[in-house]
Amino acid sequence: KVLVVESDLRPGGQLIKQTHKFFGSKDEYAGTRGFKIADILLDEINSFKDSVSILQNTTVSGYYKEDDEFTAMRGEEEYFHIKAKKTIVATGAQERLIPFPNNDIPGVYGAGAVQTLMNVYGVLPGRRVLMVGAGNIGLIVSYQLMQAGVQVAAVVEAAPRVGGYWVHAAKIRRMGVPILLRHSIKRALGEKCITGAVITGLNERFEPVGPEQQINCDLICIAVGLSPTTELLSQAGCKMMYVPQLCGNVAQRDRGMRTSNPDFYTAGDAGGIEEASAAMVEGRIAGLSAAAALGYPTEHGKLDEYWGRLQSLRKGEAGARICQGIDCVLVKDWEGVAHA
């Protein structure tokens, strides 16, 4: 029996917000829009409805190692405990924000919040936006905002080059959006709501050196990266490690995604930030390994097949960086680590 606990009203995580077509491989639904991939995966789960239950609008609030149980809350009033023989932590990531004066004025959003408003609830967060960050998320959300009729005043990026795929950058550049490299936001303008922002040039040490420029906008969208959400793994006593290539603290794991706590597995962005296609493969690896550990029959050779798919997804410069991070946390023999 499998229990899936989902904090949102609808399963699918970030996929339900994604209206663009995914890259990757055919096995991971390349060329399919994110929200449609979520439907495909949900149909796959529903085909095992006698074995899989989904708790929606439910948050796992903590793990208590001494009792070997989780606390969870559904909605705002129902609290209960969960016990499991094996646990896969696929909690994803949380948005990073940056400090600047007036960043608490209404109208400053994370990119994920903007996607939720537009693509889930059909609400425009503003009419003219300053996008902070030119990674894939910043570029994709900029394009989605423009598709919805929002004007993108500019995209500012602190690094000396665009961090996302050039295909995404080219789309918004063709539509007249300037991408200002070695620039960042200095302060937001406004009192009760955002009326503009001041941006500034940066030197090679990321220090503000000017010139400054005022941007008129009613929305500031922050897209400066993600950090793995790993609180449950830490509470379970899993060996953690800070790995810059994986964007934060992550759990050490073996090829089966098993952590130093033999009853806990990790998958997806909780184990390091990369594409959704890799998260889907890691989820299959973790599920296969957990089932095998419980004594259920599994297909021989599947683990090697899934690792081969991961390697094909982790090509290029970004993939090489991720592979470096994986090498830091991958453990061949937990017994050897325990006795080291």
Regions found by a protein language model. Give the residues of each.
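Residues forming the flavin
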Residues: 1-340
